[in-house]
Design a protein with these regions (language model features):
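Short, small-residue-biased leader/transition segments that mark boundaries at the very start
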Residues: 1-5
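AAA+ P-loop NTPase catalytic core and its hallmark functional loops
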Residues: 19-252
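Conserved AAA+ ATPase small/helical "lid" subdomain
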Residues: 240-283
């Protein structure tokens, strides 16, 4: 670990303790509260020590407003990312896909890049495109390029909204080659800490099936529907002083809506945990 400390400018034991405290204590407490296996926590600590964050992207490393709740899904995700895999989170609305993405970027201590896919997304939006600066043609780096450069976590939101020919440029980035070839520019090798996490919903307008070649480059995790403990965990983060009976009643309301939406009795538009939190704040 000496080289890591040296790069951070840490020269003695006292400074090393401060380094670990500032970068790790809060994350470790969250993981222990979730009862994550100590072996995984130890490997995460080593990951933090191994890869420092460049100064110009440190503002992208931040604790999310809502943290994910769910030991099994968290352990699966952490283990896969530690092995160097990319994740594809599939599930219905309000299952915590984006919350999990943000939580994983935070607990790994990596800069987060959010990439929202849509029907008009193309390779230039992802990798970058030529631009004219000071009478010179230069590359305007896209979010995928920046993830590769700085060891970021790329959140590929609603990846099944984009056309297959647009996301095909990611094949070499997502598989064992871990590189980006840009015509007219140098080949970029991915930083060893770079990971990508895709999210997708089925059945929404504009969505499509992902081709097998792309899906095979991810570890796919099917997100379960939220239960009472999960909803209460989210509500307690927003309302730590709220009455237990009131929070439990709101959680029950959300779960009732979830059941009705699942059976097609009501529209899934009403199934919105963010909306529930906003409604509680307004009361």
């Amino acid at each position: 670990l000496g080289d890591v400390y040296k790069r951070q400018g840490i020269t003695n034991c006292k400074e090393r303790k401060i380094f670990m405290k500032n970068n790790w204590t809060e994350i470790e407490k969250y993981l222990e509260d979730q009862k994550i296996a100590q072996e995984l926590i130890g490997e995460l600590r080593d990951f933090h020590m191994r890869y420092e964050v460049e100064n110009q992207v440190k503002e992208r490393v931040e604790k999310p407003d809502i943290l994910f709740y769910g030991k099994k899904i968290l352990e699966m995700s952490i283990a896969a990312l530690l092995q160097g895999d990319n994740l594809l989170l599939s599930g219905a609305k309000a299952t915590g896909k984006n919350v999990l993405c943000e939580t994983l970027a935070w607990i790994f201590g990596r800069p987060e890049y959010d990439i929202s896919f849509h029907v008009n997304t193309d390779s230039a939006d992802l990798i970058g495109t030529d631009t004219f600066i000071n009478n010179e043609v230069r590359l305007r780096k896209g979010p995928i390029y920046q993830c590769a450069e700085f060891g970021g976590f790329g959140i590929l939101d609603e990846i099944n909204m984009a056309k297959n020919d647009a996301v095909s440029v990611l094949h070499a980035t997502l598989d064992h080659r871990r590189r980006i070839d840009i015509p007219g520019y140098n080949r970029i090798l991915l930083h060893p800490a770079t990971r990508f996490i895709g999210t997708m919903n089925y059945g929404y307008a504009g969505t499509r099936e992902l081709n097998e070649a792309l899906v095979s480059r991810f570890m796919v995790i099917d997100m379960p529907e939220m239960d009472e403990d999960s909803v209460l965990f989210v509500l307690r983060q927003h309302f730590p002083d709220g009455e237990k009976s009131a929070l439990k009643a709101f959680a029950g309301l959300f779960l009732d809506l979830q059941i009705k939406a699942y059976h097609g009795e009501i529209s899934t538009k009403s199934l919105d945990l963010r909306g529930l939190v906003s409604a509680v704040k307004a009361t």
